């Protein structure tokens, strides 16, 4: 999609069709932007290492960095960071933070980070020419505008047409029941107009579609099959992104601000509320120096298994999830979604885990879906290459691979559910789901793991 959009727009501007560049093994070095500088000896040493280290693009599209650079870990005030081909990542695991009356948690993301690097540094493949930047800027500006519009509407409490439709159904059901109860759901309809809901939906559509196009265009810089292939530019973007974040991390830590997490395009910090304006001024100064723009998101709590798997809860109750904590959708197979729901309800409102699980009567939330290579079999019944199951009290065993006979992982206690039933099953093993959710509490560091008992070796008889 991304390449097709860019090809069409470039043809409109230049009347030339794009040809794929020749692919050869190539060695290149990072080019340092003028604003980039560090203050500590540790980061200056790493900076020098990056500048002297060659990157190699192989003919199969793989990009390699030197072993010295790949193995380098950066330790700053108790947090460890690792550079990579794709982006910077902190190395935290099983840790949680909460905001309180004294301290706040703020996530600062760079607006359209990689696209901004491309535009700020004027990067384009030689085979395409500078017109690419014109096309790219139009796409980026449209997405940023839609994102700002969406944020403005969210602040007003707008949730979109799907939410409005849900409320209309609730009102209709209450009216049918002749209930004398007050309809709290009508308040939304009184405050938010239909046009605002439609604007919200339009902004989401533009944001999501252009995100796919823009990210896809960046990804094509590393694809040998694309007319956009330019591995040196891909590294220029990702290394600039990592070093720029390290610059800001260094400034935060030198100012006594604790960085609790960092990923490809953002940094999460925890600090005293009394210092918020001071920190905001520090970030504004950094924005002026680097020509990047940051967006702030405040959290009441952040609960991490690691940098790529976490739950973040905002003060208004909105929840951001990533990785294993994200509910199943078109991009991710469902896997006991009720456990994540129970965990989030516990973190947000203190709702007992078992209460959430037992109250749910949607069997889809108890289901795991998994691709089984070569097909799976359960109690002599062939299930096919995609297995769907829940955990029950009268399981007949495990699901096994047809070819090898080996057990499909995590199928102990399972009951296949290849067709969704009309009624909720009576044999759901609630205890399994409760224990699974309690394990998630250990994954995010809220509950200590039991100590590992080492087995003592019996002394051999002489």
Q: Which stretches of residues belong to each language-model region?
A:
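Conserved "right-hand" nucleotidyltransferase catalytic core of DNA-directed polymerases
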Residues: 1-116, 243, 247-287, 292-302, ...
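Intrinsically disordered, low-complexity, compositionally biased regions/tails
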Residues: 19-21, 57, 65, 82, ...
């Amino acid at each position: 999609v991304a390449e097709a959009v860019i090809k069409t727009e470039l043809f409109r501007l230049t009347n030339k069709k794009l040809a794929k560049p020749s692919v050869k093994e190539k060695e290149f070095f990072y080019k340092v932007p003028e604003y980039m500088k560090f203050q500590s000896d540790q980061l200056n040493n790493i900076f020098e290492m990056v500048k002297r280290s060659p990157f190699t693009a192989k003919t199969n599209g793989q990009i390699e960095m030197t072993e010295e650079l790949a193995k380098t870990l950066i330790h700053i005030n108790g947090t460890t960071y690792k550079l990579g081909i794709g982006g910077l990542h902190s190395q935290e695991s099983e840790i949680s933070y909460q905001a309180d009356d004294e301290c706040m948690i703020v996530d600062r993301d760079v607006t359209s980070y990689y696209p901004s690097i491309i535009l700020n540094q004027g990067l384009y493949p030689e085979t395409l020419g500078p017109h690419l930047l014109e096309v790219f800027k139009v796409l980026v500006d449209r997405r940023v505008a839609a994102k700002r519009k969406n944020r403005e509407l969210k602040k007003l409490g707008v949730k979109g047409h799907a939410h409005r439709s849900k409320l209309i159904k609730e009102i209709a059901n209450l009216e049918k029941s002749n209930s004398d109860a007050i309809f709290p759901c009508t308040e939304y309809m009184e405050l938010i107009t239909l046009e605002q809901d439609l604007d919200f939906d339009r902004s989401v559509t533009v944001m999501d579609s252009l995100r796919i196009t823009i990210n896809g265009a960046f990804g094509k810089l590393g694809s040998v099959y694309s007319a956009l292939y330019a591995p040196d530019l891909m590294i220029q973007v990702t290394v600039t992104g990592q070093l720029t974040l390290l610059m800001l991390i260094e400034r935060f830590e030198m100012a006594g601000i604790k960085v609790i997490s960092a990923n490809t395009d953002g940094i999460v910090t925890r600090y005293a509320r009394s210092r918020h304006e001071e920190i905001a001024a520090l970030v504004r100064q950094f924005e002026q120096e680097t020509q990047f723009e940051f967006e702030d998101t405040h959290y009441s709590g952040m609960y991490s298994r690691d940098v790529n798997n976490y739950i973040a809860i905002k003060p208004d109750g909105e929840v951001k999830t990533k990785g294993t904590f994200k509910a199943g959708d078109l991009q991710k197979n469902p896997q006991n979604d009720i456990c994540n729901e129970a965990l989030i309800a516990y973190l947000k409102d203190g709702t007992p885990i078992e209460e959430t699980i037992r109250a749910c009567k949607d069997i889809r939330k108890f289901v795991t879906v998994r691709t089984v290579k070569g097909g799976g079999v359960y109690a002599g019944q062939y299930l096919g290459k995609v297995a769907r199951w829940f955990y029950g009290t009268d399981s007949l065993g495990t699901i096994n691979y047809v070819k090898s006979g080996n057990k499909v992982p995590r199928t102990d206690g399972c009951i296949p559910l290849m067709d969704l039933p009309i009624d909720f099953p009576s044999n759901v093993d609630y205890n399994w789901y409760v224990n699974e959710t309690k394990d998630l509490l250990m994954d995010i560091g809220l509950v200590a793991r039991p100590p590992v008992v080492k087995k003592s070796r019996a002394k051999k008889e002489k």
